[in-house]
Amino acid sequence: MFDILVYLFENYYTPQACPAADVLAKRLAAAGFEHEDIDDALGWLYGLAETTERCVELAHAPATGIRIYTDAEYQQLGTESIGFITFLESAGVLPAPLREIVIDRALASPETPISLSKIKIIALMVLWSQEAEIDNLVLEELLDDEGSRRLH
């Protein structure tokens, strides 16, 4: 599933450039992805859209508080991923509403604890879905595990 998410980032400049889900599924299958992974990725993206709609209200809340993770979140995310999310937030890359979306999408992953490389992909996809400007150094960090990628 995560390979498909990175593929979408690399091949579509914005989420609006992606075709409808059925057409996208056919293109992904033609690119060699497994149908089960395609279904997982499309479901994950649907969840991303739903979470984004719910987090719109958070955009107006003051972002002066400290995020306290529940035990379940801590177990699913792990120390390394929580540290990375905190790093992105303190660097000004990930505002509180987007942080909550990253956490929600990470909790939707079956991996426990989720690896740092997958958290990076999730953060990248959340920023991509919001068409956020991503500094080149941050982009390099988010894509660090996989070697060279095509930059937008």
UniProtKB/Swiss-Prot annotation:
Q: Which domain of life is it from?
A: Bacteria
* Pfam families, alphabetized: DUF494 (PF04361)
Family the entry assigns? Belongs to the Smg family.
Q: Enumerate the HAMAP family for this protein.
A: Smg
Query: Which protein is depicted?
Result: Protein Smg homolog
Give the taxonomic lineage as stored in the record: Bacteria, Pseudomonadati, Pseudomonadota, Betaproteobacteria, Burkholderiales
